[in-house]
Protein backbone atom coordinates (compact mmCIF):
# COMPACT_ATOMS: atom_id res chain seq x y z
CA UNK A 1 0.00 0.00 0.00
CA UNK A 2 2.79 2.45 0.91
CA UNK A 3 4.81 1.91 -2.30
CA UNK A 4 1.79 2.15 -4.58
CA UNK A 5 0.50 5.35 -2.99
CA UNK A 6 3.95 6.96 -3.28
CA UNK A 7 4.24 6.00 -6.97
CA UNK A 8 0.77 7.40 -7.76
CA UNK A 9 1.70 10.65 -6.04
CA UNK A 10 4.91 11.04 -8.06
CA UNK A 11 3.06 10.51 -11.34
CA UNK A 12 0.37 13.05 -10.45
CA UNK A 13 2.99 15.55 -9.24
CA UNK A 14 4.89 15.38 -12.54
CA UNK A 15 1.66 15.93 -14.48
CA UNK A 16 0.72 18.87 -12.25
CA UNK A 17 4.11 20.51 -12.69
CA UNK A 18 3.84 20.18 -16.45
CA UNK A 19 0.41 21.84 -16.48
CA UNK A 20 1.66 24.69 -14.28
CA UNK A 21 4.64 25.33 -16.55
CA UNK A 22 2.38 25.38 -19.61
CA UNK A 23 0.06 27.85 -17.87
CA UNK A 24 3.01 30.14 -17.08
CA UNK A 25 4.09 30.19 -20.72
CA UNK A 26 0.60 31.26 -21.85
CA UNK A 27 0.43 34.02 -19.23
CA UNK A 28 3.88 35.28 -20.20
CA UNK A 29 2.78 35.40 -23.83
CA UNK A 30 -0.42 37.29 -23.02
CA UNK A 31 1.23 39.82 -20.73
CA UNK A 32 4.28 40.24 -22.93
CA UNK A 33 6.60 40.31 -19.96
CA UNK A 34 9.36 38.12 -18.65
CA UNK A 35 8.18 38.73 -15.10
CA UNK A 36 5.18 36.42 -15.40
CA UNK A 37 6.91 33.58 -13.65
CA UNK A 38 7.76 35.80 -10.71
CA UNK A 39 4.11 36.78 -10.28
CA UNK A 40 3.21 33.10 -9.87
CA UNK A 41 5.90 32.37 -7.29
CA UNK A 42 3.39 31.50 -4.57
CA UNK A 43 1.90 28.60 -6.52
CA UNK A 44 4.57 27.35 -8.92
CA UNK A 45 6.83 24.52 -7.73
CA UNK A 46 9.04 24.27 -10.81
CA UNK A 47 12.68 23.19 -10.54
CA UNK A 48 14.05 26.71 -11.14
CA UNK A 49 12.11 28.04 -8.19
CA UNK A 50 13.21 25.18 -5.95
CA UNK A 51 16.80 25.72 -6.93
CA UNK A 52 16.54 29.42 -6.16
CA UNK A 53 15.29 28.59 -2.69
CA UNK A 54 18.13 26.19 -2.09
CA UNK A 55 20.62 28.96 -2.81
CA UNK A 56 19.19 31.44 -0.31
CA UNK A 57 21.95 32.36 2.12
CA UNK A 58 21.84 31.28 5.74
CA UNK A 59 21.05 34.74 7.15
CA UNK A 60 18.04 35.12 4.90
CA UNK A 61 16.76 31.65 5.87
CA UNK A 62 17.10 32.51 9.57
CA UNK A 63 15.23 35.74 9.02
CA UNK A 64 12.39 33.95 7.28
CA UNK A 65 12.29 31.27 9.98
CA UNK A 66 11.81 33.96 12.63
CA UNK A 67 8.84 35.53 10.83
CA UNK A 68 5.70 35.61 12.99
CA UNK A 69 2.94 33.47 11.42
CA UNK A 70 -0.28 35.09 10.32
CA UNK A 71 -3.41 34.95 12.41
CA UNK A 72 -4.96 32.50 9.96
CA UNK A 73 -2.05 30.08 10.21
CA UNK A 74 -2.07 30.26 14.01
CA UNK A 75 -5.81 29.62 14.21
CA UNK A 76 -5.64 26.58 11.89
CA UNK A 77 -2.80 24.31 13.07
CA UNK A 78 -1.93 21.55 10.62
CA UNK A 79 -2.39 17.94 11.66
CA UNK A 80 1.22 16.77 12.30
CA UNK A 81 0.47 13.43 10.64
CA UNK A 82 -1.18 14.86 7.54
CA UNK A 83 1.40 16.01 4.97
CA UNK A 84 1.29 19.63 3.79
CA UNK A 85 -0.48 20.69 0.62
CA UNK A 86 1.58 20.74 -2.56
CA UNK A 87 2.50 24.22 -3.74
CA UNK A 88 2.29 27.29 -1.52
CA UNK A 89 -1.13 28.57 -0.61
CA UNK A 90 -1.82 31.90 1.09
CA UNK A 91 -1.35 30.40 4.58
CA UNK A 92 1.70 28.22 3.90
CA UNK A 93 5.16 29.75 4.39
CA UNK A 94 7.83 29.41 1.74
CA UNK A 95 9.69 26.12 1.93
CA UNK A 96 13.11 25.99 3.54
CA UNK A 97 15.88 23.59 2.74
CA UNK A 98 15.92 21.39 5.82
CA UNK A 99 18.66 19.33 7.35
CA UNK A 100 18.80 16.01 5.49
CA UNK A 101 19.25 14.00 8.68
CA UNK A 102 16.13 15.61 10.13
CA UNK A 103 14.11 14.77 7.03
CA UNK A 104 15.19 11.12 7.17
CA UNK A 105 14.26 10.85 10.85
CA UNK A 106 10.93 12.61 10.18
CA UNK A 107 10.15 10.02 7.51
CA UNK A 108 10.99 7.20 9.89
CA UNK A 109 8.75 8.74 12.55
CA UNK A 110 5.64 8.95 10.34
CA UNK A 111 6.09 5.86 8.16
CA UNK A 112 3.60 3.89 10.26
CA UNK A 113 0.89 6.41 9.38
CA UNK A 114 1.11 5.78 5.62
CA UNK A 115 -1.76 3.34 5.25
CA UNK A 116 -4.02 4.47 2.39
CA UNK A 117 -3.29 4.70 -1.34
CA UNK A 118 -4.98 8.11 -1.55
CA UNK A 119 -2.86 9.54 1.27
CA UNK A 120 -0.09 11.92 0.23
CA UNK A 121 3.44 10.99 1.31
CA UNK A 122 4.77 13.11 4.17
CA UNK A 123 6.54 16.37 3.42
CA UNK A 124 9.87 14.83 4.43
CA UNK A 125 9.62 12.12 1.75
CA UNK A 126 8.64 14.64 -0.90
CA UNK A 127 11.58 16.88 -0.03
CA UNK A 128 14.09 14.02 0.05
CA UNK A 129 12.90 12.87 -3.37
CA UNK A 130 13.33 16.37 -4.80
CA UNK A 131 16.81 16.64 -3.31
CA UNK A 132 17.82 13.28 -4.82
CA UNK A 133 17.16 14.55 -8.34
CA UNK A 134 20.75 15.83 -8.46
CA UNK A 135 23.90 13.76 -7.94
CA UNK A 136 24.95 15.87 -4.96
CA UNK A 137 21.52 15.61 -3.36
CA UNK A 138 21.33 11.85 -3.96
CA UNK A 139 24.70 11.38 -2.27
CA UNK A 140 23.54 13.50 0.68
CA UNK A 141 20.41 11.35 1.09
CA UNK A 142 22.33 8.06 0.91
CA UNK A 143 24.95 9.19 3.41
CA UNK A 144 22.23 10.39 5.77
CA UNK A 145 20.43 7.04 5.60
CA UNK A 146 23.67 5.32 6.60
CA UNK A 147 24.40 7.84 9.33
CA UNK A 148 21.13 8.35 11.21
CA UNK A 149 18.77 5.34 10.89
CA UNK A 150 18.85 3.80 14.39
CA UNK A 151 19.51 0.11 15.00
CA UNK A 152 16.54 -0.46 17.28
CA UNK A 153 13.75 0.74 14.96
CA UNK A 154 12.17 -2.32 13.26
CA UNK A 155 11.18 -0.24 10.23
CA UNK A 156 14.63 1.33 9.73
CA UNK A 157 15.85 -0.95 6.91
CA UNK A 158 12.42 -0.82 5.24
CA UNK A 159 12.59 2.99 5.21
CA UNK A 160 16.03 2.81 3.57
CA UNK A 161 14.58 0.56 0.88
CA UNK A 162 11.45 2.67 0.44
CA UNK A 163 13.32 5.95 0.05
CA UNK A 164 16.03 4.62 -2.27
CA UNK A 165 13.59 2.60 -4.35
CA UNK A 166 11.54 5.69 -5.15
CA UNK A 167 14.46 8.10 -5.65
CA UNK A 168 15.67 8.69 -9.23
CA UNK A 169 18.22 6.18 -10.48
CA UNK A 170 21.75 7.35 -9.64
CA UNK A 171 24.09 8.23 -12.47
CA UNK A 172 27.31 6.34 -13.08
CA UNK A 173 29.24 9.31 -11.69
CA UNK A 174 27.12 9.33 -8.52
CA UNK A 175 27.76 5.62 -7.95
CA UNK A 176 31.47 6.11 -8.47
CA UNK A 177 31.49 9.03 -6.05
CA UNK A 178 29.58 6.97 -3.46
CA UNK A 179 32.12 4.13 -3.59
CA UNK A 180 34.92 6.68 -3.14
CA UNK A 181 33.18 8.29 -0.16
CA UNK A 182 32.44 4.98 1.57
CA UNK A 183 35.86 3.52 0.70
CA UNK A 184 34.77 0.08 1.91
CA UNK A 185 37.09 -2.86 2.56
CA UNK A 186 37.67 -5.55 5.15
CA UNK A 187 39.36 -3.18 7.58
CA UNK A 188 36.41 -0.77 7.52
CA UNK A 189 34.08 -3.66 8.46
CA UNK A 190 36.12 -4.19 11.64
CA UNK A 191 35.90 -0.53 12.67
CA UNK A 192 33.17 0.81 14.98
CA UNK A 193 32.11 -2.71 15.94
CA UNK A 194 30.49 -1.21 19.02
CA UNK A 195 28.15 0.83 16.78
CA UNK A 196 26.64 -1.72 14.38
CA UNK A 197 23.92 0.61 13.02
CA UNK A 198 26.33 2.18 10.51
CA UNK A 199 27.37 -1.22 9.10
CA UNK A 200 23.78 -2.49 9.05
CA UNK A 201 22.63 0.60 7.18
CA UNK A 202 25.57 0.46 4.75
CA UNK A 203 24.73 -3.14 3.87
CA UNK A 204 21.04 -2.27 3.48
CA UNK A 205 21.92 0.57 1.09
CA UNK A 206 24.22 -1.69 -0.96
CA UNK A 207 21.54 -4.38 -1.14
CA UNK A 208 18.90 -1.92 -2.29
CA UNK A 209 21.19 -0.52 -4.99
CA UNK A 210 22.13 -4.03 -6.15
CA UNK A 211 18.44 -4.91 -6.50
CA UNK A 212 17.58 -1.66 -8.25
CA UNK A 213 20.58 -1.66 -10.61
CA UNK A 214 20.76 -5.35 -11.54
CA UNK A 215 23.00 -5.77 -14.59
CA UNK A 216 26.19 -3.92 -15.62
CA UNK A 217 25.73 -1.22 -12.97
CA UNK A 218 25.47 -3.88 -10.26
CA UNK A 219 28.63 -5.57 -11.57
CA UNK A 220 30.48 -2.25 -11.41
CA UNK A 221 29.21 -1.56 -7.90
CA UNK A 222 30.50 -4.87 -6.51
CA UNK A 223 34.14 -3.81 -6.33
CA UNK A 224 36.75 -6.03 -4.62
CA UNK A 225 36.63 -3.68 -1.63
CA UNK A 226 32.84 -3.89 -1.26
CA UNK A 227 32.90 -7.68 -1.62
CA UNK A 228 35.63 -7.91 1.03
CA UNK A 229 33.60 -5.61 3.29
CA UNK A 230 30.41 -7.71 3.02
CA UNK A 231 32.26 -10.98 3.54
CA UNK A 232 34.03 -9.57 6.60
CA UNK A 233 30.63 -8.56 8.00
CA UNK A 234 29.59 -12.24 7.89
CA UNK A 235 32.21 -13.25 10.45
CA UNK A 236 30.94 -14.48 13.80
CA UNK A 237 32.49 -11.50 15.58
CA UNK A 238 30.01 -9.18 13.85
CA UNK A 239 26.66 -8.12 15.30
CA UNK A 240 23.89 -10.48 14.04
CA UNK A 241 21.97 -7.65 12.36
CA UNK A 242 25.13 -6.65 10.46
CA UNK A 243 25.59 -10.27 9.38
CA UNK A 244 21.95 -10.46 8.27
CA UNK A 245 21.99 -7.41 6.01
CA UNK A 246 25.43 -8.19 4.61
CA UNK A 247 24.08 -11.60 3.56
CA UNK A 248 20.94 -10.04 2.06
CA UNK A 249 23.12 -7.59 0.11
CA UNK A 250 25.19 -10.48 -1.27
CA UNK A 251 21.97 -12.27 -2.27
CA UNK A 252 20.84 -9.21 -4.21
CA UNK A 253 24.19 -8.76 -5.89
CA UNK A 254 23.94 -12.43 -6.93
CA UNK A 255 20.82 -11.64 -9.00
CA UNK A 256 23.36 -10.75 -11.71
CA UNK A 257 25.06 -13.91 -12.94
CA UNK A 258 28.57 -12.40 -13.12
CA UNK A 259 28.30 -11.24 -9.52
CA UNK A 260 26.95 -14.63 -8.45
CA UNK A 261 30.02 -16.32 -9.89
CA UNK A 262 32.35 -13.81 -8.23
CA UNK A 263 30.70 -14.24 -4.83
CA UNK A 264 30.63 -18.04 -5.13
CA UNK A 265 34.38 -18.08 -5.81
CA UNK A 266 34.97 -16.33 -2.48
CA UNK A 267 34.11 -19.54 -0.56
CA UNK A 268 31.06 -17.86 0.96
CA UNK A 269 29.33 -21.24 1.29
CA UNK A 270 31.84 -22.30 3.96
CA UNK A 271 30.76 -19.38 6.14
CA UNK A 272 27.06 -19.99 5.49
CA UNK A 273 27.25 -23.63 6.59
CA UNK A 274 28.10 -22.39 10.07
CA UNK A 275 25.43 -19.69 10.05
CA UNK A 276 22.59 -21.99 8.93
CA UNK A 277 22.83 -23.74 12.31
CA UNK A 278 21.09 -20.64 13.71
CA UNK A 279 17.87 -21.37 11.79
CA UNK A 280 16.15 -22.63 14.97
CA UNK A 281 17.97 -20.38 17.44
CA UNK A 282 15.81 -18.93 20.26
CA UNK A 283 17.42 -15.53 19.57
CA UNK A 284 15.13 -14.20 16.83
CA UNK A 285 17.86 -12.07 15.26
CA UNK A 286 20.17 -15.05 14.91
CA UNK A 287 17.21 -17.06 13.63
CA UNK A 288 16.83 -14.62 10.74
CA UNK A 289 20.51 -15.03 9.90
CA UNK A 290 20.12 -18.82 9.97
CA UNK A 291 17.03 -18.70 7.76
CA UNK A 292 18.76 -16.54 5.13
CA UNK A 293 21.97 -18.60 5.27
CA UNK A 294 20.04 -21.83 4.70
CA UNK A 295 18.01 -20.28 1.88
CA UNK A 296 21.17 -18.98 0.18
CA UNK A 297 22.87 -22.38 0.43
CA UNK A 298 19.82 -24.05 -1.12
CA UNK A 299 19.13 -21.47 -3.83
CA UNK A 300 22.24 -19.41 -4.67
CA UNK A 301 25.59 -20.39 -3.22
CA UNK A 302 25.55 -24.19 -3.46
CA UNK A 303 28.22 -26.12 -1.58
CA UNK A 304 29.57 -29.28 -3.14
CA UNK A 305 28.69 -32.34 -1.08
CA UNK A 306 26.01 -30.54 0.97
CA UNK A 307 22.58 -32.14 0.88
CA UNK A 308 19.82 -29.66 0.04
CA UNK A 309 17.56 -28.99 3.01
CA UNK A 310 14.34 -30.18 1.34
CA UNK A 311 15.95 -33.59 0.81
CA UNK A 312 16.50 -34.19 4.53
CA UNK A 313 13.74 -32.26 6.34
CA UNK A 314 11.17 -34.39 8.20
CA UNK A 315 7.67 -33.64 6.91
CA UNK A 316 5.86 -36.71 8.25
CA UNK A 317 3.75 -34.78 10.76
CA UNK A 318 2.97 -31.85 8.46
CA UNK A 319 -0.32 -32.03 6.53
CA UNK A 320 -0.82 -28.31 5.83
CA UNK A 321 1.80 -25.73 4.88
CA UNK A 322 2.37 -22.55 2.91
CA UNK A 323 1.67 -23.18 -0.76
CA UNK A 324 4.78 -22.71 -2.90
CA UNK A 325 2.50 -22.76 -5.97
CA UNK A 326 0.22 -20.01 -4.63
CA UNK A 327 2.73 -17.33 -3.72
CA UNK A 328 4.06 -14.09 -5.18
CA UNK A 329 7.43 -14.34 -6.87
CA UNK A 330 9.97 -13.09 -4.32
CA UNK A 331 8.78 -14.61 -1.04
CA UNK A 332 11.17 -17.08 0.61
CA UNK A 333 9.53 -20.19 2.10
CA UNK A 334 11.37 -22.60 4.40
CA UNK A 335 11.79 -26.26 3.32
CA UNK A 336 9.23 -27.40 5.92
CA UNK A 337 6.71 -24.93 4.51
CA UNK A 338 5.84 -23.23 7.79
CA UNK A 339 8.10 -20.16 7.79
CA UNK A 340 8.24 -17.30 5.29
CA UNK A 341 10.35 -14.21 4.77
CA UNK A 342 10.42 -11.24 2.39
CA UNK A 343 13.67 -9.42 1.54
CA UNK A 344 12.39 -7.77 -1.66
CA UNK A 345 11.20 -4.18 -2.00
CA UNK A 346 7.72 -5.43 -3.01
CA UNK A 347 4.80 -6.57 -0.80
CA UNK A 348 4.94 -10.37 -1.05
CA UNK A 349 1.99 -12.67 -0.23
CA UNK A 350 1.19 -16.37 0.20
CA UNK A 351 -1.78 -18.63 0.94
CA UNK A 352 -1.66 -22.01 2.67
CA UNK A 353 -2.50 -25.33 1.05
CA UNK A 354 -5.79 -26.04 2.88
CA UNK A 355 -9.17 -24.43 2.21
CA UNK A 356 -12.11 -24.39 4.65
CA UNK A 357 -15.82 -23.93 3.91
CA UNK A 358 -17.64 -24.72 7.18
CA UNK A 359 -16.94 -25.00 10.88
CA UNK A 360 -14.56 -23.24 13.30
CA UNK A 361 -10.82 -23.12 12.55
CA UNK A 362 -7.75 -21.76 14.29
CA UNK A 363 -4.04 -21.26 13.58
CA UNK A 364 -1.19 -19.33 15.16
CA UNK A 365 1.76 -17.28 13.95
CA UNK A 366 4.99 -16.59 15.81
CA UNK A 367 6.33 -13.10 15.08
CA UNK A 368 10.03 -13.30 14.17
CA UNK A 369 10.31 -9.65 13.05
CA UNK A 370 8.15 -6.83 14.37
CA UNK A 371 7.68 -4.82 11.18
CA UNK A 372 4.74 -4.55 8.77
CA UNK A 373 2.93 -7.80 7.97
CA UNK A 374 -0.76 -8.30 7.16
CA UNK A 375 -1.81 -11.79 8.28
CA UNK A 376 -5.27 -13.33 8.31
CA UNK A 377 -7.71 -15.05 5.98
CA UNK A 378 -8.24 -14.86 2.21
CA UNK A 379 -10.23 -16.68 -0.45
CA UNK A 380 -8.96 -17.79 -3.84
CA UNK A 381 -10.41 -14.58 -5.32
CA UNK A 382 -8.04 -12.40 -3.29
CA UNK A 383 -5.35 -11.04 -5.62
CA UNK A 384 -1.62 -10.78 -4.95
CA UNK A 385 -0.45 -7.50 -6.52
CA UNK A 386 2.99 -7.38 -4.94
CA UNK A 387 4.49 -4.59 -7.05
CA UNK A 388 1.42 -2.37 -6.53
CA UNK A 389 1.60 -2.90 -2.77
CA UNK A 390 -1.67 -4.84 -2.44
CA UNK A 391 -1.85 -7.93 -0.26
CA UNK A 392 -4.05 -9.69 2.28
CA UNK A 393 -6.76 -7.34 3.57
CA UNK A 394 -6.54 -5.09 0.52
CA UNK A 395 -9.63 -6.41 -1.27
CA UNK A 396 -13.15 -7.55 -0.38
CA UNK A 397 -12.12 -11.22 -0.26
CA UNK A 398 -9.65 -11.03 2.63
CA UNK A 399 -9.19 -9.63 6.13
CA UNK A 400 -5.88 -9.16 7.94
CA UNK A 401 -4.31 -8.25 11.28
CA UNK A 402 -1.42 -5.75 11.24
CA UNK A 403 0.36 -5.75 14.60
CA UNK A 404 3.05 -3.23 13.67
CA UNK A 405 0.71 -0.39 12.70
CA UNK A 406 -2.04 -1.71 15.06
CA UNK A 407 -4.65 -2.01 12.32
CA UNK A 408 -7.28 -4.38 10.97
CA UNK A 409 -7.37 -4.43 7.15
CA UNK A 410 -10.35 -5.13 4.90
CA UNK A 411 -10.94 -4.01 1.30
CA UNK A 412 -7.83 -1.77 1.33
CA UNK A 413 -9.21 0.20 4.27
CA UNK A 414 -7.93 0.01 7.82
CA UNK A 415 -9.23 0.63 11.31
CA UNK A 416 -7.21 0.73 14.54
CA UNK A 417 -7.30 -2.03 17.14
CA UNK A 418 -6.43 -1.85 20.85
CA UNK A 419 -3.62 -4.40 20.97
CA UNK A 420 -0.10 -3.06 21.63
CA UNK A 421 2.46 -3.24 18.83
CA UNK A 422 3.64 -6.80 18.36
CA UNK A 423 7.25 -7.69 19.08
CA UNK A 424 9.61 -10.55 18.32
CA UNK A 425 8.37 -13.78 19.91
CA UNK A 426 4.73 -12.72 20.20
CA UNK A 427 2.03 -15.21 19.20
CA UNK A 428 -0.89 -14.07 17.05
CA UNK A 429 -3.98 -16.28 16.92
CA UNK A 430 -6.47 -16.40 14.04
CA UNK A 431 -9.95 -17.87 14.60
CA UNK A 432 -12.40 -18.30 11.73
CA UNK A 433 -15.98 -19.15 12.74
CA UNK A 434 -17.93 -19.90 9.58
CA UNK A 435 -21.02 -20.89 11.58
CA UNK A 436 -21.35 -17.42 13.13
CA UNK A 437 -19.64 -15.71 10.18
CA UNK A 438 -16.93 -13.97 12.17
CA UNK A 439 -13.14 -13.72 12.50
CA UNK A 440 -11.39 -13.17 15.83
CA UNK A 441 -7.76 -12.08 16.22
CA UNK A 442 -5.67 -12.74 19.35
CA UNK A 443 -2.32 -11.39 20.56
CA UNK A 444 -0.73 -13.64 23.17
CA UNK A 445 -4.19 -14.93 24.07
CA UNK A 446 -5.90 -11.52 24.31
CA UNK A 447 -8.73 -11.33 21.80
CA UNK A 448 -10.22 -8.47 19.83
CA UNK A 449 -13.94 -8.03 19.03
CA UNK A 450 -15.11 -10.18 16.08
CA UNK A 451 -14.69 -8.94 12.49
CA UNK A 452 -17.58 -9.68 10.13
CA UNK A 453 -17.28 -7.31 7.15
CA UNK A 454 -15.61 -9.82 4.80
CA UNK A 455 -18.69 -12.06 4.92
CA UNK A 456 -20.67 -9.51 2.93
CA UNK A 457 -18.59 -10.59 -0.09
CA UNK A 458 -17.87 -14.27 0.54
CA UNK A 459 -18.88 -16.95 3.04
CA UNK A 460 -16.64 -19.91 2.18
CA UNK A 461 -13.38 -21.00 0.59
CA UNK A 462 -11.00 -19.41 3.11
CA UNK A 463 -7.24 -19.97 3.35
CA UNK A 464 -4.78 -18.82 5.97
CA UNK A 465 -2.77 -16.09 4.22
CA UNK A 466 -0.19 -13.37 4.84
CA UNK A 467 1.61 -10.44 3.20
CA UNK A 468 5.09 -9.22 4.10
CA UNK A 469 6.86 -5.87 3.79
CA UNK A 470 10.63 -5.82 3.27
CA UNK A 471 12.78 -7.74 5.78
CA UNK A 472 9.85 -9.37 7.60
CA UNK A 473 9.54 -12.99 8.73
CA UNK A 474 7.14 -15.17 10.72
CA UNK A 475 6.42 -18.84 11.44
CA UNK A 476 3.03 -20.54 11.07
CA UNK A 477 1.52 -23.31 13.19
CA UNK A 478 -1.41 -25.04 11.50
CA UNK A 479 -1.71 -27.63 14.26
CA UNK A 480 1.39 -29.80 13.79
CA UNK A 481 2.54 -28.54 17.21
CA UNK A 482 0.49 -27.68 20.32
CA UNK A 483 -0.85 -24.12 20.27
CA UNK A 484 0.49 -21.62 22.80
CA UNK A 485 -2.84 -19.84 23.32
CA UNK A 486 -5.72 -22.07 22.15
CA UNK A 487 -9.14 -20.35 22.32
CA UNK A 488 -11.74 -21.58 24.80
CA UNK A 489 -14.31 -22.57 22.16
CA UNK A 490 -14.16 -25.85 20.26
CA UNK A 491 -12.24 -25.59 16.98
CA UNK A 492 -10.56 -27.65 14.27
CA UNK A 493 -7.02 -27.39 12.89
CA UNK A 494 -5.78 -27.65 9.33
CA UNK A 495 -3.31 -30.35 10.28
CA UNK A 496 -6.09 -32.63 11.54
CA UNK A 497 -8.11 -32.55 8.31
CA UNK A 498 -5.72 -31.67 5.47
CA UNK A 499 -3.79 -34.13 3.35
CA UNK A 500 -0.74 -33.67 1.16
CA UNK A 501 1.09 -36.27 -0.87
CA UNK A 502 4.83 -36.62 -0.36
CA UNK A 503 5.37 -34.84 -3.68
CA UNK A 504 3.05 -31.96 -2.76
CA UNK A 505 5.02 -31.33 0.43
CA UNK A 506 8.28 -30.70 -1.41
CA UNK A 507 9.34 -27.06 -1.71
CA UNK A 508 12.01 -27.11 -4.37
CA UNK A 509 14.85 -24.57 -4.53
CA UNK A 510 14.51 -22.23 -7.47
CA UNK A 511 17.30 -23.77 -9.53
CA UNK A 512 15.61 -27.19 -9.24
CA UNK A 513 12.25 -25.72 -10.26
CA UNK A 514 13.84 -24.08 -13.31
CA UNK A 515 15.52 -27.35 -14.27
CA UNK A 516 12.16 -29.15 -14.15
CA UNK A 517 10.48 -26.44 -16.21
CA UNK A 518 13.09 -26.87 -18.92
CA UNK A 519 12.14 -30.54 -19.18
CA UNK A 520 8.43 -29.86 -19.59
CA UNK A 521 7.09 -30.67 -23.02
CA UNK A 522 4.30 -28.31 -24.06
CA UNK A 523 1.82 -29.47 -26.67
CA UNK A 524 1.32 -27.42 -29.78
CA UNK A 525 -2.36 -26.80 -29.16
CA UNK A 526 -2.22 -26.12 -25.41
CA UNK A 527 -3.66 -23.06 -23.68
CA UNK A 528 -1.20 -20.16 -23.73
CA UNK A 529 -1.95 -19.33 -20.09
CA UNK A 530 -2.12 -22.58 -18.12
CA UNK A 531 -0.26 -24.77 -20.68
CA UNK A 532 -2.28 -27.74 -19.36
CA UNK A 533 -5.58 -27.80 -21.23
CA UNK A 534 -6.26 -27.68 -24.98
CA UNK A 535 -6.79 -24.21 -26.46
CA UNK A 536 -10.40 -24.78 -27.47
CA UNK A 537 -12.06 -21.41 -26.84
CA UNK A 538 -12.55 -18.40 -29.09
CA UNK A 539 -13.06 -14.95 -27.60
CA UNK A 540 -15.63 -12.61 -29.11
CA UNK A 541 -15.53 -10.07 -30.64
CA UNK A 542 -11.72 -10.08 -31.12
CA UNK A 543 -11.60 -13.72 -32.35
CA UNK A 544 -8.42 -14.80 -30.53
CA UNK A 545 -8.43 -18.49 -29.67
CA UNK A 546 -5.28 -19.41 -27.73
CA UNK A 547 -7.05 -20.20 -24.45
CA UNK A 548 -8.93 -23.03 -22.77
CA UNK A 549 -12.42 -22.39 -21.43
CA UNK A 550 -11.29 -22.48 -17.78
CA UNK A 551 -8.79 -19.66 -18.34
CA UNK A 552 -11.14 -17.71 -20.61
CA UNK A 553 -13.82 -17.63 -17.92
CA UNK A 554 -11.39 -15.93 -15.53
CA UNK A 555 -10.63 -13.06 -17.93
CA UNK A 556 -12.55 -9.87 -18.62
CA UNK A 557 -10.28 -8.65 -21.44
CA UNK A 558 -8.32 -10.50 -24.10
CA UNK A 559 -4.68 -10.92 -22.98
CA UNK A 560 -3.48 -10.40 -26.56
CA UNK A 561 -5.37 -7.32 -27.74
CA UNK A 562 -6.94 -6.02 -24.50
CA UNK A 563 -10.42 -5.88 -26.03
CA UNK A 564 -13.32 -6.55 -23.69
CA UNK A 565 -14.60 -10.14 -23.85
CA UNK A 566 -18.31 -10.24 -24.68
CA UNK A 567 -18.65 -14.00 -25.15
CA UNK A 568 -16.61 -17.22 -25.21
CA UNK A 569 -17.22 -20.01 -27.72
CA UNK A 570 -15.88 -23.53 -27.30
CA UNK A 571 -14.62 -24.61 -30.72
CA UNK A 572 -13.92 -28.34 -30.29
CA UNK A 573 -14.65 -31.21 -27.95
CA UNK A 574 -11.72 -32.97 -26.36
CA UNK A 575 -10.74 -35.31 -23.58
CA UNK A 576 -8.37 -33.68 -21.06
Swiss-Prot record:
Glycans are attached at residue 65. PROSITE patterns: B302_SPRY, ZF_RING_2. Residues 58-73 have a biased composition (Polar residues). The modification Phosphoserine is found at residue 50. A zinc finger (RING-type) spans 527-562. GO terms for cellular component: extracellular region. Induction: Up-regulated in response to denervation-induced skeletal muscle atrophy. Induced by MYOD1. The keyword Secreted applies. Residues 53-99 are annotated as: Disordered. Residues 300-483 form the B30.2/SPRY domain. One of its GO terms (molecular function) is ubiquitin-protein transferase activity. Residues 83-97 have a biased composition (Basic residues). It holds the Pfam family SPRY. Keywords: Glycoprotein, Metal-binding, Phosphoprotein, Secreted, Signal, Zinc, Zinc-finger. Coiled coil: none annotated. It comes from the Eukaryota. This is RING finger and SPRY domain-containing protein 1. It comes from Mus musculus (Mouse).
Amino acid sequence: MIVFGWAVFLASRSLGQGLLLTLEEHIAHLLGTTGATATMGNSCICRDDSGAEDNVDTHQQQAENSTVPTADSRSQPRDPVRPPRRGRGPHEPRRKKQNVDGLVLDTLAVIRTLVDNDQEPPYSMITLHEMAETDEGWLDVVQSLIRVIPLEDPLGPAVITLLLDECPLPTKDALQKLTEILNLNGEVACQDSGHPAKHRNTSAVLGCLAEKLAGPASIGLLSPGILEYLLQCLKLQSHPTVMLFALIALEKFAQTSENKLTISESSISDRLVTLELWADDPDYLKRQVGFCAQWSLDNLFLKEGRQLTYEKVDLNNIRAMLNSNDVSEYLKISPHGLEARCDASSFESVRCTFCVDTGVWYYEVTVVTSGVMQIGWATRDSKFLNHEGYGIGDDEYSCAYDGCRQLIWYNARSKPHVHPCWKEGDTVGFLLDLNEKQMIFFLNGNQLPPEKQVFSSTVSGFFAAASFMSYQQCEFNFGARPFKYPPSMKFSTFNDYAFLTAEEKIILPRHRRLALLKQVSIRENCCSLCCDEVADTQLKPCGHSDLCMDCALQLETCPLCRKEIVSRIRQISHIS
